[in-house]
């Protein structure tokens, strides 16, 4: 039986150095920071496939501070600044909660209205303070749709589609036409 290929997923970006021992501040880009940056976890630098093994991590003033076994001093930490950190995951690995979705599984899904008419595709997911927002490409125009059940009643990853409520102007090319 053929093994399934893995998918590279961004989990963080290295910010500034913290202290003299090689610790770095990580801008978290994952819903599972404690698992992805727990002691013993391994991440890679995007593009280089260089492994970094977490030896310490802690939260301080809302920032994740991480020490990697391969980085011994501040100079090594400074060299990592700006590096994007990735992990390999199974492509069909989904959250346990049926109402949660990984961004990578939503990108590219076809967006249809309640009548089934194709309206565009999910381009990205923005994580805002109030709620997540879908960026939907409609004929080359980006439309922002709050990712809430009232506006997005159905998400069917298996069939590759999302249903968006038919609110006038929400996905219209020219919002003025909806008035």
Curated annotation (Swiss-Prot):
Chief localisation class: cytoplasm
Coiled-coil stretches noted in the UniProt entry, renumbered to this chain: none
Residue ranges annotated for the PRC barrel domain, each copy included: 98-170
One GO CC term on file: ribosome
Subcellular location: Cytoplasm
Keyword annotations of the record: Chaperone, Cytoplasm, Ribosome biogenesis, rRNA processing
Subunit annotation: Binds ribosomal protein uS19.
Record remark on domains: The PRC barrel domain binds ribosomal protein uS19.
Record-stated family: Belongs to the RimM family.
Official protein name in the record: Ribosome maturation factor RimM
Organism encoding this protein: Cutibacterium acnes (strain DSM 16379 / KPA171202)
């Amino acid at each position: 039986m053929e093994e399934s290929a893995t998918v590279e997923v961004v989990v963080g970006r290295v910010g500034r150095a913290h202290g003299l021992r090689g610790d770095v501040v990580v801008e978290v880009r994952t819903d599972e920071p404690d698992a992805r940056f727990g002691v013993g976890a391994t991440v890679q630098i995007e593009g280089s496939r260089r492994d970094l093994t977490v030896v310490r991590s802690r939260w301080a003033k809302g920032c994740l501070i991480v020490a990697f076994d391969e980085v011994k001093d501040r100079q090594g930490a400074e060299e990592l600044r700006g590096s994007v950190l990735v992990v390999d995951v199974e492509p069909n690995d989904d959250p346990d909660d049926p109402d949660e979705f990984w961004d990578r599984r939503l990108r590219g899904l076809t967006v249809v209205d309640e009548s089934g008419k194709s309206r565009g595709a999910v381009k990205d997911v923005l994580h805002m303070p109030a709620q997540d927002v879908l960026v939907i490409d409609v004929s080359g125009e980006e439309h922002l749709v709050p990712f809430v059940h009232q506006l997005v009643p159905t998400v069917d990853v298996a069939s590759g589609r999302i249903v968006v409520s038919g609110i006038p102007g929400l996905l219209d090319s020219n919002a003025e036409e909806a008035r």
